Amino acid sequence: MFFKNSVNCTRKKQDLLRMEQITPYKPLHKVRIVTAASLFDGHDAAINIMRRIIQSTGVEVIHLGHDRSVEEVVNCAIQEDANAIAMTSYQGGHNEYFKYMYDLLQEKGATHIKIFGGGGGVILPEEIKELMDYGITRIYAPDDGRELGLQGMINDLVKTADFA
C-alpha cells in the first residue's frame, strides 16, 4: 500500500510541476468575461478559483456568483459588452441551460459572445459533444483538467475570448 501511495504522490508532484511550467496567456485585446454558477447550483468553489486565475491574466471578470438564471447571465454579458461567459453547472439540467443560453444570445443579436462551461464529471462526454455541436464554444471535462491543467484550461478560454 505504501508503494502505491508513494507512486501516486510522485505522479501528482510531476503533474504539479508540469502545470507550474505553463505560462499564463496574456490577452492582446481588452477581454471581459462574465462568470457564474448555474441556476439551482450552489457549488461555486470551482468558478471562484477559475475567476481569480482568469483575473490574474489581466482579464476583467464580472462575477455573478451562484444560482444564476440564463436571462441574468445573458443580460449581464450584453450590458457589460463581454467577450465570453464562463459557467459551472454541477446540478444537472446543463443541456437545457446551455442551449437556452446559446439561443437567447442568438435571439438578442449577441452572437459574438462565446460560451464556456464545465461541471466536473456531471456533464457526460456525449453531452459535451452534443452541446458543442449545438454551438457552445467549449465544455471542459475532467480529462481536459488532467491534460491541460487548470492554467492550460484558463489559457484556452482567454485565448479563444481574445478578439477585438
Language model features with spans:
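Short hydrophobic segments within beta-strands
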Residues: 34-36
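Aromatic (phenylalanine/tyrosine) cluster motif
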Residues: 2-3
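Cofactor-cradling patches in redox/metallo enzymes
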Residues: 40, 47-57, 61-152
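A charged, well-structured terminal subsegment
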Residues: 147-164
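Non-catalytic signal-transmission and effector/linker regions of two-component phosphorelay proteins
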Residues: 17-31, 163
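Cationic, low-complexity basic patches in intrinsically disordered or flexible, solvent-exposed regions
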Residues: 14
